[in-house]
């Protein structure tokens, strides 16, 4: 081969065992590489960390790397939890399981597998769901924070690329098998949940060339539980209101209570297969297949103290606490007293059916099948490197749900005189010590007994909501890449073309019935075979004494296994009871359908350079995208019949994305990096659709798409310094700055509520705000029973202002292996630590206080005309976060302990409501989590270990309005232990 590669280029090509095989280089080049550049083999924690560090060091852009053993010895069960180890990355969790990833404060990232785009189960753009990917099938991963022109567009924070084992790089036959069992501290199921994973790989050579194959698979079950108590105190009893409960001061009464028991049962199957063939030293062909099946069954329950607000005028708290709201939008919101402990009694003279006890069974499950296929080849000549591949990613998801609600009919209190299917139950509450605790006031008048609470005759059917929505996502792509090598300061020129076609299709398949009268609601003895006692261990997490222990729900396990049978039984009960309503099987909703496709053509050109201590690349990426959206237009004729017609809209856009990366090796052990580039973030598919889906509840907002939503534009700058002061050790500091234009933000419009009665508009159109929901229950928001009410709306819009994200990242990795003579056994220790400080500023899109919240703020500020609003900012961004890992590896023992902490951040994940409480995203308080693992090599072929997640059972606290203001939600999570 005439072209001669530089040592730096050779280092990049020879890194580790996880990259693509570079067998296509000529023997002369391979020999030089082997002589001049150290190749680090992955074997054990220490070696894998060193290998990952070496790979990062010789990259021409800013990339973070984790490799095989590094992943395998962490107590991480899915992709999100693996990524939490990287500087600048935080994760969000659902019931303790990592489900979301923020890179440099943003969720707007991309996920690839072997460089192929992935698609998720929903309608987002970030790729495959993080909880769907088992850590056991990942051989390594890269997070590109500063892209080059080759990098596919679409990420704001970074691009995550998962790597699988390359067959032709195996130096010997690979065979491994792992068996584990996991236990959750809060689950009611006994025993261990199984986890199995295995890998086989080998390569061989004959007259037709060299062949290699790797097959990996995993099967895992997981049972995770979290308790999420909720207390609403978003109303006002003014001192001058004249009601019986009024005090000499204004205070916040109790509005609503929820005892939310979340349980998710995961069954995850992953398969990865790779085949490679190299007919000669210059040519390689490959085929990859990644198949994932994820089944997440929800078996959750909710106990609700509803109608509590009806007693606000007479219920006097026993004690109060002072709530300081802080400031929003530059306005000091002052402070107020809030109910802390007390009893909400039954007062038949005031209200003959409130407060009441409502019992729900939630089974919002997800079944997803994801497939990724990749076929391609590459050829290396004297001056050229050419590669081409076709790839297909798909994800088909069904979200089966069968949610039911029962009302408890208290036999010690009279039936509602108006015929409603609920009646009064007394409650008590104690919110001291940061515990949102409530339960039945057992010593109060009309209190039911345990036997009465568990008697099927004392519950009636209230709601049935069935859904079987489907989402089909795909991306098919073809790309070809060329490299021309030069013997100048410009070492090579890369250029290429990529075509992709992506789409998302959704069908809203549902049915529902709401029963509001005793005349229509069958009692539980008519469907008693469906009823079970709800979980009675709500005190296991924090030892609380006050909670609702005894109640009945429709068996969520039976619903999951036989939904049609449950539906048939409920309909038979309604028929026997003589109900005027009926339950139908789920059908497709015309208003909830959309089918969106986009085609993209992308070209790039990039020059790679190396001169003395400088190296890097500069280039440009150009793309054109055309979007076609199909939805339904629904009108009503003169006779009231629904007329459905399909409407197709098209749009297009193009962008030029320049990118540059410069690396300076200023000393043998010091590297400086600079990166600058432009990228875009496309809107989520459902944010473009004008299709709408209504809920039978008056509380959730209705999501309305925005077909005029345009991609975000982001310009990023990176500056970093890395000091490799010892073998396998580094200290680094980096600065990043991102300017975002047309940020996608949530615009929420809340319906008007009368400050005295709390009633909403019950007729269409909703002049005071929101949208008319024809099937929503009026509930406490109107004077009479029925359906049809104004509810809130939420729509994604482009922020008209420019926003900025900037921050500093610090990291240190230190290994004591070099001090074995001085330290002996203690030389097995090592430490990794990172710290990120970041901030978000700018933007003009604002959230505004709800009408009830405005009444409270008028009282706390003395300004009756106050209008409180604040820039929404960026959700899920913690300004400060750190991660510390201490490990030990010696004498066959491999142990790690990792503590992760992140500062408070605003979130839209706040349990049993989808509306912004008080009109603003909730604030999730500071939280840390401790994980650990210990493994021991019994011999060369057998390893045993134990892993622990959330050892200290760290709780989640969420506040309304501001951090530390009004505690609204809790998340009491489990500890999970895995052995094997």
Per-region residue spans from a language model:
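Extracytoplasmic beta-strand/coil segments of soluble accessory domains associated
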Residues: 80-118, 145
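N-terminal periplasmic "start-of-domain" segments of outer-membrane beta-barrel proteins
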Residues: 41-72, 116-121
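Short loop/turn motifs that connect adjacent beta-strands in outer-membrane beta-barrel proteins
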Residues: 151, 167-173, 205-211, 282, ...
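C-terminal beta-signal and adjacent terminal beta-strands/loops
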Residues: 517, 739-741, 900-913, 935-980
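Outer-membrane beta-barrel signature, preferentially recognizing the C-terminal barrel domain
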Residues: 366-370, 596-599, 651, 680-740, ...
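Transmembrane beta-barrel wall of Gram-negative outer-membrane proteins
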Residues: 189-341, 346, 366-376, 382, ...
């Amino acid at each position: 081969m005439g072209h001669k590669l530089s040592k730096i280029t050779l280092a990049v090509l020879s890194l580790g065992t996880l990259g693509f095989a570079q067998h296509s280089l000529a023997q002369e080049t391979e020999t030089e590489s082997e002589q001049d550049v150290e190749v680090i083999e992955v074997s054990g924690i220490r070696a894998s960390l060193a290998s990952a560090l070496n790979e990062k060091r010789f990259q021409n852009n800013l990339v973070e790397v984790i490799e095989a053993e590094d992943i395998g010895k962490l107590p991480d069960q899915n992709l999100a939890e693996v990524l939490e180890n990287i500087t600048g990355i935080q994760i969000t969790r659902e019931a303790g399981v990592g489900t979301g990833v923020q890179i440099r404060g943003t969720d707007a990232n991309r996920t690839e597998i072997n460089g192929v785009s992935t698609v998720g189960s929903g309608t987002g753009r970030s790729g495959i769901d993080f909880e769907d990917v088992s850590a056991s099938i990942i051989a390594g991963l890269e997070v590109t924070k500063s892209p080059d022109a080759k990098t596919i567009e679409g990420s704001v924070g970074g691009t995550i690329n998962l790597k699988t084992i390359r067959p032709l790089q195996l130096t010997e036959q690979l065979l491994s098998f792992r068996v584990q069992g996991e236990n959750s501290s809060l689950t009611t199921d006994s025993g261990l949940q199984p986890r199995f994973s295995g890998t086989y790989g080998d390569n061989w050579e004959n007259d037709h060339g060299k062949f290699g194959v790797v097959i990996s698979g995993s099967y895992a079950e997981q049972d995770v539980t979290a308790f999420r108590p909720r207390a609403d105190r978003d109303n006002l009893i003014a001192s001058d209101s004249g009601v019986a409960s009024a005090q000499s001061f204004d205070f916040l009464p109790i509005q609503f209570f929820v005892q939310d028991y979340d349980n998710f049962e995961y069954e995850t199957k992953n398969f990865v297969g790779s085949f490679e063939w190299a007919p000669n030293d210059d040519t390689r062909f490959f085929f990859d297949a990644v198949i994932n099946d994820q089944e997440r069954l929800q078996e959750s329950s909710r106990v609700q103290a509803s109608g509590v607000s009806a007693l606000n005028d007479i219920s006097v708290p026993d004690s109060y606490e002072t709530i300081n709201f802080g400031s929003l939008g530059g306005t000091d919101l002052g402070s107020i007293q809030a109910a802390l402990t007390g009893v909400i009694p039954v007062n038949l003279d005031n209200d003959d059916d409130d407060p009441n006890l409502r019992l729900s069974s939630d089974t919002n499950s997800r079944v997803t099948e994801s497939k990724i296929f990749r076929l391609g080849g590459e050829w290396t000549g004297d001056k050229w490197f050419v590669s081409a591949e076709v790839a297909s990613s798909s994800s088909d998801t069904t979200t089966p749900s069968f949610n039911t609600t029962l009302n408890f009919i208290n036999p010690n209190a009279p039936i509602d005189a108006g015929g409603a299917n609920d009646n009064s139950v007394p409650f008590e509450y104690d919110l001291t010590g940061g515990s949102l605790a409530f339960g039945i006031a057992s010593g109060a008048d009309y209190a039911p007994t345990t036997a009465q609470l568990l008697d099927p005759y004392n519950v009636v059917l209230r709601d049935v909501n069935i859904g079987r929505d489907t989402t089909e996502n795909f991306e098919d792509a073809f790309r070809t890449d060329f490299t021309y090598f030069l013997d100048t300061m410009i070492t090579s020129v890369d250029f290429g073309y990529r075509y992709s076609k992506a789409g998302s299709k959704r069908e809203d398949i549902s049915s529902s019935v709401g029963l509001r009268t005793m005349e229509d609601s069958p009692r539980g003895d008519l469907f008693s075979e469906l009823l079970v006692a709800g979980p009675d261990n709500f005190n296991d997490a924090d030892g609380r004494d006050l909670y609702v222990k005894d109640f009945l729900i429709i068996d969520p396990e039976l619903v999951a296994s036989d939904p049609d049978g449950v539906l048939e039984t409920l309909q038979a009960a309604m028929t026997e009871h003589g109900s005027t309503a009926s339950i139908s099987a789920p059908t497709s909703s015309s208003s909830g359908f959309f089918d969106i496709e986009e085609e993209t053509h992308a070209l790039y050109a990039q020059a790679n350079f190396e001169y003395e201590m400088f190296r890097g690349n500069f280039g440009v990426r150009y793309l054109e995208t055309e979007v076609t959206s199909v939805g339904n237009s629904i009108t009503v004729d003169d006779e009231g019949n629904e007329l459905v017609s399909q409407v197709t809209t098209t749009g297009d856009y193009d962008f030029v994305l320049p990118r540059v990366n410069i690396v300076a090796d200023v000393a043998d052990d010091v590297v400086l990096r600079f990166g600058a580039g432009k990228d875009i973030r496309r809107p989520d598919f459902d944010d473009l659709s004008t299709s709408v889906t209504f809920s039978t509840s008056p509380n959730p907002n209705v999501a309305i798409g925005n077909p005029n939503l345009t991609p975000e534009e982001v310009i990023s700058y990176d500056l970093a310094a890395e000091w490799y002061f010892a073998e396998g050790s580094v200290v680094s500091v980096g600065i990043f700055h991102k300017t975002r234009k047309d940020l996608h933000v949530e615009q929420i419009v809340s319906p008007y509520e009368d400050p005295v009665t709390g009633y909403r508009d019950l007729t269409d159109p909703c002049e005071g705000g929101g949208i008319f929901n024809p099937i929503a229950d009026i509930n406490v928001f109107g004077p009479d029973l029925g359906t049809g009410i104004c509810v809130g709306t939420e729509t994604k819009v482009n922020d008209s202002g420019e926003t900025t994200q900037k921050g500093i990242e610090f990291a240190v990795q230190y290994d004591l292996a070099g001090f074995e003579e001085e330290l002996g056994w203690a030389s097995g220790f090592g430490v990794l630590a990172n710290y990120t400080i970041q901030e978000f500023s700018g933007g003009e899109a604002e959230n505004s206080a709800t009408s009830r919240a405005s009444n409270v703020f008028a009282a706390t500020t003395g300004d009756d005309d106050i209008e409180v609003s604040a820039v929404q900012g960026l959700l899920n961004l913690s300004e400060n976060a750190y991660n510390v890992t201490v490990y030990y590896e010696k004498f066959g023992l491999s142990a790690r302990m990792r503590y992760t902490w992140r500062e408070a951040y605003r979130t839209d994940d706040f349990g049993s409501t989808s509306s912004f409480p008080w009109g603003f995203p909730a604030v999730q308080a500071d939280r840390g989590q401790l994980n650990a693992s210990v493994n021991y090599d019994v011999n060369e072929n057998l390893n045993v270990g134990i892993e622990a997640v959330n050892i200290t059972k760290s709780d989640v606290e969420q506040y309304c309005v501001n951090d530390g203001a009004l505690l609204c939600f809790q998340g009491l999570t489990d500890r999970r232990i895995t052995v094997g």
